[in-house]
Design a protein with these regions (language model features):
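Extended non-transmembrane interhelical loops and adjacent amphipathic helices
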Residues: 1-16, 97-143, 205-251, 319-333, ...
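Membrane-integrated ABC transporters
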Residues: 1-43, 64, 88, 92, ...
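Transmembrane helix-loop-helix hairpins at lipid-water interfaces of multipass membrane proteins
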Residues: 30-84, 162-195, 273-276, 280, ...
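ABC-fold ATPase nucleotide-binding domain signature/coupling loops
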Residues: 128, 370-371, 409, 415, ...
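Cytosolic ends of transmembrane helices, especially the final helix of ABC transmembrane type-1 domains
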Residues: 230, 273-274, 295-332
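Helix-to-loop junction immediately C-terminal to a conserved catalytic motif
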Residues: 404
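ABC ATPase nucleotide-binding domain helical subdomain, centered on the C-loop/LSGGQ "ABC signature"
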Residues: 415, 430, 448-495, 539-540, ...
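C-terminal portion of ABC ATPase nucleotide-binding domains
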Residues: 484, 540, 548, 556-557, ...
Length: 613
């Protein structure tokens, strides 16, 4: 288990932070909460004192009319207070979900806008998951920190009033109640500490359980689950995480159960002692029957307020820790510029030279000194078509993500037209790049909207979108569809949606990259899901599709590299060989060896098919 880190922010700091946000986002909630304190205090004291008045009136032989006036007057006052309380409570409740929604919206927007590398860091993801789990529930700190603090203020007022009343009659009863509350508070502290110490473990188990649940319900995996009989494995994995979750829950609840049992025993002892003291005083004539009821009620309310205060302070401390999660996630540093930076080159000035200077990169989760890329030096000339090849895990995709501004170098720098890309506004820098990555992610838009990367039809240049679809090889498919480019994507979201094949999805991604008309076009295995005919068509059109751009091209099929100006062969995170196809073949090195293996494999396959025919 990881060594627990000390919280970055103190409880007081987090409380002040939460109150400032509450005032900024829901000022009316606080203003309408102010009448609550005098109303609750008066209602409690009146509820204690009114029975004494009635009992004393009866024992003193007052008339029924006098008693009736007392009862009616009391309930009229109570009714008026409850009307005011109900009105202010309803006004407060309007903001019940507003504040946590503000926290969650800000959290989500930060998730969208933070450096991409931050979303790929397990430690940062844990911070986000913890903060999001609190902001997304009405029982978290985001929704209840102010409410808990307000409850403490109300309970302190009640406690002070009851303590003053009890002290006048018998200080020993007050001491008994305080001792009982202190013992209960210690139990509560121990249980809260246990919950805090196991919060990360709980979050990790719930994350794993949630992943398995999401995986099993994802339509994309349904075929694999059925064909490969994965149901049993998924069921076993879910049960394993469920069992671990239940174990943690049982351990926590066992402690709370012990606290509740202790609370009942303490309540019994406290009530017994109070009854003995007050009964003795009643028989000695020191108090009246009305005083007896009044004092017993005061003891009960004092114990309740002390219990609430102790519980609320522990809860407030826990909420403070949770608020710290939120603040710590927002404190994660951004290395790239967001919303500021040097002006980016205009499209008219593109393409431009791109240079990697002694670039090394290590993933945040990597152990020790394990680098994905080591001391990479390369210069991509303006308008050059560059192939990046190598075995799986060599570092090809990592290099491309660095170029795209998704990752930043651990060492060295990347320069566009002589300017370090970290000096640009990264969001503007992204506008210079079109990319087709290995991962295909479709979102529920129309085909036209998806290609134009917008959900507003008026922003779509339909002629341009159709041209890009045709260039990508989807023209005939679009013409076959009843709604053409207005067909919705992703079945399961809309009833009239369509599903595309793997190859068609890859063509759609290519069409989107072409529509953007950026100065840098990154193609990461753009033919992986295409059939041989479609793949060959793409090769033939490659120069036309990337005309006027700088285009890094990643491929496992080395035959495709003939269309590129230069080839970089990467091995173990380093550039092992560099040159044109003919130059690398003449070197008879690693590239030539791999090319020979692939050529022999494809040649043997062709011969086998011809023999079978």
């Amino acid at each position: 288990m990881k060594k627990k880190e000390k919280p970055k922010y103190s409880a007081v700091s987090n409380i002040i932070y939460a109150l400032k946000n509450e005032w900024r986002w829901a000022k009316d909630k606080i203003l309408f909460d102010l009448p609550r304190y005098p109303i609750e205090l008066f209602t409690m004291l009146a509820g204690m004192y009114f029975p004494k008045l009635i009992i004393d009136a009866i024992t003193m032989g007052q008339t029924a009319w006098y008693i009736a006036v007392l009862v009616v007057g009391y309930y009229l006052i109570l009714l008026a207070l409850r009307i005011v309380s109900g009105y202010t409570s309803n006004r407060r409740f309007r903001y019940h979900y507003y504040v946590p929604m503000k926290y969650q919206n800000r959290l989500t927007m930060r998730r969208f806008t933070t450096d991409f590398q931050n979303t790929d860091d397990p430690d940062i993801n844990l911070k986000y998951n913890k903060a999001d789990s609190d902001a997304s529930t009405t029982s978290g700190a985001a929704n209840n920190m102010y409410t808990t603090l307000a409850g403490i203020i109300s309970s302190i007022l009640g406690m002070a009033s009851c303590a003053a009343i009890i002290t006048v009659i018998s200080p020993w009863i007050l001491v008994t109640v305080i001792i009982e509350a202190a013992i209960y508070y210690l139990f509560s502290c121990a249980n809260m500490k246990y919950a805090r110490d196991h919060a990360d473990e709980n979050a990790d188990v719930n994350r794993r359980k949630g992943y398995i649940a999401g995986f099993s319900s994802n339509f994309e995996y349904a075929k694999d689950i059925k064909i490969y009989g994965m149901r049993g494995w998924i069921d076993d994995m879910f049960k394993q995480f469920q069992s671990e979750s239940l174990r943690l829950y049982k351990n926590e609840q066992t402690r709370w159960c012990a606290q509740r049992v202790t609370g009942v025993l303490l309540y019994t002892v406290r009530h017994g002692i109070s009854y003995l003291f007050l009964t003795a005083m009643l028989f000695d004539g020191k108090i009246t029957p009305g005083d007896f009821v009044f004092m017993l009620s005061a003891v009960g309310n004092l114990a309740t307020d002390l219990s609430r205060i102790s519980w609320s302070f522990n809860t407030l401390y826990d909420y403070s820790r949770r608020m710290g999660w939120y603040r710590e996630y927002f404190d994660i540093p951004e290395r790239f510029n967001h919303g500021e930076g040097e002006p980016i080159p205009t499209r008219a000035n593109m393409p431009m030279d791109i240079e990697f200077k002694d670039v090394s990169f290590k993933y945040p989760s990597a152990d020790g000194e394990k680098y994905a890329l080591k001391h990479v030096n390369l210069k991509i000339k303006a308008g050059e078509k560059l192939a990046i090849v190598g075995r799986n895990g060599a570092g090809k995709t990592t290099l491309v993500k660095l170029l795209c501004g998704l990752y930043y170098p651990s060492e060295g720098g990347i320069f566009l037209g002589g300017t370090d890309i970290e000096k640009f506004n990264v969001d503007e820098y992204y506008s210079l790049i079109s990319a087709v990555f290995q991962d295909i992610n479709i979102i529920p838009l129309t085909i036209a909207q998806f290609v134009a990367a917008t959900d507003i039809d008026e922003d779509v240049d339909r002629g341009r979108a159709m041209k890009c679809l045709e260039l990508a090889g989807l023209g005939d498919k679009i013409k076959e569809l009843e709604k053409g480019m207005d067909s919705r994507l992703m079945k399961g979201i809309y009833d009239d949606s369509i599903d595309l094949s793997g190859g068609e999805k890859q063509k759609l991604m290519l069409a989107r990259a072409l529509y953007k008309n950026a100065g840098i076009v990154v193609l990461d295995e753009p033919t992986a899901a295409l059939d041989p005919i479609a793949e060959n068509e793409l090769y033939l059109k490659y120069n036309m599709l990337t005309k006027g751009t700088t285009s890094p091209y990643i491929s496992h099929r080395l035959a495709s590299t003939r269309f590129c100006d230069r080839i970089f062969y990467i091995e173990d995170g380093e550039i092992a060989e560099c040159g044109t196809h003919d130059e690398l073949m003449a070197m008879n090195g690693k590239y030539a060896y791999m090319y020979g293996l692939q050529s022999r494999y494809y040649s043997e396959n062709v011969n086998v098919r011809e023999a079978e025919a």
